[in-house]
Amino acid sequence: MNKLLLFSVFSILTLNVMAQEKIVQTAGRDQLGTFAPKFAELNDDVLFGEVWSRTDKLGLRDRSLVTITSLISMGITDNSLVYHLQSAKKNGITRTEIAEIITHIGFYAGWPKAWAAFNLAKGVWSEDIVGEDAKTAFQREMI
């Protein structure tokens, strides 16, 4: 019982701290800094530094879900989708959930787009234990 109470308090405190963290992104400057400095600035400082950092309005997990859905729906299956799939996994979207999300998207955005997304998602979630979600594994580690 004490472990459960301690875990609950820790989770609440951690979520409050996480909600206040500013997302730091340098991919724009790293990849496009001298070629397209304004775009790099907007990517790093506005999109990630401001929009993604408004976690008090919409959490990172939900932002990841919206972003993945948008990219797949547009047929974007390049390194940007891989990056956002990796972020989604870090933000708590499980292997089971991503499979269901992509399946659902397939009916609305197109079957070939879902196939392409599955090929990338399999790589991101390849090391997950078969039949287990990241949440379950994380919860087991915390006990």
Which functions belong to the PLM regions below?
Residues 74-79, 110-113:
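Short helix-coil transition sites and intra-membrane helix breaks within transmembrane domains
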Residues 20-62, 82, 90, 114-143:
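Acidic, glycine/proline-rich low-complexity segments that act as flexible tails and inter-domain linkers
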Residues 79-103:
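A cross-kingdom feature marking solvent-exposed beta-strand/loop segments within repeated
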Residues 62-72, 81, 98-102:
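Short, structured motif recognition centered on aromatic/hydrophobic residues
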Residues 104-105, 109, 117:
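C-terminal binding/interaction regions
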Residues 1-4:
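Positively charged n-region of N-terminal signal peptides that target proteins for export
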